[in-house]
């Protein structure tokens, strides 16, 4: 049963990768296999680090407290994602090149947050291909929302290694699928209607563990 929770959580925190890949595919941009591996490694590394932090926190609280806390963290993150989806339309950005993945203003994170808000900005050299440092920045940008979920997952007792591998595989898979889908589909508005799924999955997993 825990493996089901791990797969669902990995799915929830990796769906943004599909959205970004889809956006790039529509613009006929390319992400080489090596760059996809870099993105996967970044996603897995961020998840692993966040879960180590979560595991460290479990040493200071009783088991029954950590179980509730982990569930509440996932519910909270999921609720935030749903808020971003359902908030008034006037506050949203609908331009393709400014497809918003996370409405969060943290100036200290600079370019990472900028990439989250405008995925096309990850192509720093405007070459139409995501490579090198661009892949690293994109990988970390896609992992920001997974950081809190990783802490919650560790508190719930999930394996950091298994969870990190699952997220790495899911994120690379969804980026690849998104790019291919974007190449073949000219209409993309339907994908916006699915943006609530990560939040719903996180809330479901969190409530399941409460």
UniProtKB/Swiss-Prot annotation:
Pfam families: Mntp. The gene is ytaF. Keywords: Cell membrane, Membrane, Sporulation, Transmembrane, Transmembrane helix. Disulfide bonds: none annotated. This is Probable sporulation protein YtaF. The lineage of its organism: Bacteria, Bacillati, Bacillota, Bacilli, Bacillales. Disruption phenotype: Disruption of the gene causes a 10-fold reduction in the efficiency of sporulation. Mutants divide asymmetrically but fail to complete engulfment of the forespore by the mother cell. The keyword Transmembrane helix applies. One of its GO terms (biological process) is sporulation resulting in formation of a cellular spore. It comes from Bacillus subtilis (strain 168). One of its GO terms (cellular component) is plasma membrane. Induction: Expression is regulated by the sporulation transcription factor sigma E. The chain crosses the membrane at residues 6-26, 36-56, 69-89, 129-149, 162-184, 190-210. It is found in: Cell membrane. One of its GO terms (molecular function) is manganese ion transmembrane transporter activity.
């Amino acid at each position: 049963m825990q493996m089901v929770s791990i797969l669902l959580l990995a799915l929830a925190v990796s769906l943004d990768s599909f959205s970004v890949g889809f956006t790039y595919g529509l613009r006929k941009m390319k992400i080489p296999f090596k760059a996809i591996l870099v993105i996967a490694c970044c996603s897995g590394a961020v998840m692993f680090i966040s879960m180590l932090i979560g595991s460290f926190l479990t040493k200071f609280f009783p088991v029954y407290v950590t179980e509730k806390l982990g569930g509440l963290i996932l519910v909270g993150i999921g609720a935030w994602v749903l808020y971003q989806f359902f908030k008034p339309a006037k506050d949203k950005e609908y331009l393709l090149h400014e497809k918003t993945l996370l409405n969060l203003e943290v100036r200290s994170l600079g370019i990472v947050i900028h990439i989250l808000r405008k995925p096309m900005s990850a192509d720093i050299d405007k070459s139409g291909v995501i490579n090198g440092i661009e892949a690293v920045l994109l990988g970390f940008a896609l992992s920001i929302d997974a950081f809190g979920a990783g802490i919650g997952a560790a508190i719930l007792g999930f394996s950091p290694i298994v969870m990190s591998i699952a997220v790495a595989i899911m994120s690379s898979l969804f980026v690849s699928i998104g790019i291919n889908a974007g190449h073949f589909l000219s209409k993309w508005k339907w994908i916006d209607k699915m943006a609530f799924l990560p939040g719903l999955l996180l809330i479901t997993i969190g409530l399941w563990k409460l």
